[in-house]
Amino acid sequence: GILNETSKQKFTDLQSKGASQIAKLATECGVKTFVHFSAIGADINSHSKYLKSKAEGEEMVKASFKNAVILRPSIVFGAEDQFFNRFATMAKLSPLIPLVGGETKFQPVYVDDIAKAAVKGVLGEAKRGIYELGGPQAASFKELIIMLMGIIRRKRAIVNIPFFAASIQGGIFDALQKFSLGLFTNTILTRDQVIALKKDNVTSKNKMGFKNLGIVPTAMETILGEYLYRHRPYGQYTELTEAARDLDS
C-alpha cells in the first residue's frame, strides 16, 4: 500500500481495487491460503481516505477469498522503519519536533513479529479473519518521541500542533503537490493524515491478535537501540564518548 497519494497513485486504486484484483487472481489460480495486509483503524465509515480504502480492500478481499487472513498492524518499527527513523532524522536537522496529535496513542509492532504472523497465515496455521497486531506497549505520540530522543541522545523541544492548524498546513502542502505538476510530492503532512491522527492506533479487545497466533510480541526497548544508534551525535561511539567525558569530569 501507500501512505500518501500522488497524481498517479490513489488509495482506492491500490488498496481497494488492487487488493481485490490480487485476491480474485489468487482464487482463480487455486491458491489455498491468502494473507492481506491492512492497518489498524481501517473503517469503511472513516473520514480518512487512507483508512476507508483499507477497509474497502478488506471487504473486497473477503468477497473473493473467503478464507483470507487479514493482518492489521499498528505503526511498524524495524531497521528501515518510516516512523522512528523519520523523527530521528528530523532531530538531527532541527531543534524543534512538531507533533500533530501528541496525545494520540500508538502500539508499535516489530516488523519481524508481523512476518511471523504472515508466515502462519501462509502455512494455514491461522484461522481466517482479522488480526490486529500491536506490540506489548501502547504509548502516546509524544511519549514515543520522548523515548526516541533518549535513545538517540538528543534534546529537542517538542511542539504540539493543534489539529485545526495542522489541517490547514496539510491542505497547503496538498495543494502544492496538486498544482506543482509533479515537482513537489507531499511527504511532509497531508490533510488525510491529520484526520487519521485524531483516532488512537491501538488493538481492539474484540479482535484476534498475536495471542491467537501463539506469538509473543517484541518490546520496543529491546530493538530500537540496535538500529537507531546511527542517529546519535557520535553514532556507535556515543557511549564511549560519554564515558570518556564522565572520566574527565
Short names for language-model regions:
Residues 38, 58-82, 89:
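Conserved beta-loop-beta element that borders a ligand/cofactor-binding pocket
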Residues 11-16, 35, 54, 107:
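Short alpha-helix in the Rossmann-fold core of NAD(P)-dependent oxidoreductases
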Residues 105-112, 131-151, 160-171, 216-218:
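Substrate-binding strand-loop-helix patch
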Residues 88-101:
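A short C-terminal helix-loop "cap" of Rossmann-like NAD(P)-dependent dehydrogenase/epimerase domains
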Residues 164-249:
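A hydrophobic C-terminal alpha-helical subdomain
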Residues 5, 40-52, 76-81:
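Conserved catalytic-site region of short-chain dehydrogenase/reductase
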Residues 1-28, 40-44:
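NAD(P)H-binding glycine-rich loop region in Rossmannoid oxidoreductase-like domains
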Residues 18-21, 82-83, 101-123, 129-135, ...:
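Substrate-positioning beta->alpha
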